[in-house]
Amino acid sequence: TVPYNTGTRHETCTALSTQAQQYYTDGAETLLKLSGSTSDSSLESMDSALYRALQSLMTDTMTDSVTYKSLPTYWARTDASQGKDGLLLFYSDTTGGRMSREHVWPKSRASFMQQNGGSDLHHLRPEDSGVNSTRSNYTMGNVLGVYPDCTTKAFDGKTVLWYSSKNDRVEVADNVKGDLARVLLYVYCRWGQPNLFEKVSTDNLPPYDSDDRENTGMPVIESLDTLLEWMQEDPVDTWEMSRNDCVQQVQGNRNVFIDYPEFAWLLFGRELPADYDTPSGYSHEHGSDVENFTLTAASSDETRGTVTVRSHTVTAFPAEGYCVGGYTLTPADAAVVKQNGNVFT
């Protein structure tokens, strides 16, 4: 019998569960020492020793699977709210609604439909059908402060989605962003879907499952920076850890990015943040202290447009019709700035 999820939402998890500790039979330290990629490409990063090892671990230990139809039966326990108090919806982060099966990684951007990755408990989550429909298959990314004409979707009296259809972007609530990022990383690694944060050509996409006929190869999240930012802003909570335990009892495998979120940074050759609370505490012990600095932005001609700052991203409005002149840093080595059109990161 699958136990009920007894964790607490938004209670930061600072210790590995007993199941998590036992899962890494040779010790996670061996994995943590493997080389990740030196590329910012999600496709090229699949060739690294760390990626291959994590994929093998999550594949080899997945000794069982469930059907697409049976998912709600398992969710009643794996996604229980506070023990047995209803089913927790994914984006809405509350109970109630008209439940539907949500592919967090959109079907149209994957090689699966309702088999394999399309019926994996670590991937598919319950969501209100109206919210699910609004989410559509848009690329996840920052919308607030980036697209001023964005639309919102509310559920149970609170906004749960911000989206811009014409820009193919949707943003979830801050307290769901980490959960979502860790699901995407799992699908990327376990099911070998290369278009995590870049568009991938048909030649480099995995073959379709027997019930699938479409994979656009479009990215599921806008950038690696956004992925890691969301991971850090919304750390693993005890509910996620408990859910990982519950799903392991069904499928045999775990989402390693819940136990060790640090793998996300190591996969892509990024330095671990030292101020990041994780279940293992590895980031605190091995992360780099990042020097704090203040980010300000101003338009040189506010009659033509404005700029906004959100987290580490500066965006100029309108996106078209005028030229972004450049940037200056004080001190000069305070940060590395990348420019992509009207967006600085």
Feature annotation, model-predicted:
Residues 94-100, 104-287:
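Domain-level detector of nuclease and nuclease-like folds
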Residues 291-310, 334:
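Short, solvent-exposed loop/edge segments of extracellular or virion-exposed proteins
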Residues 2, 11, 309, 344-345:
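Generic detection of short hydrophobic beta-strand segments and adjacent strand-loop junctions
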Residues 313-345:
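Surface-exposed interfaces of beta-sheet-rich extracellular modules
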Residues 1-93, 266-286:
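N-terminal module-boundary/linker segments of secreted carbohydrate-active enzymes
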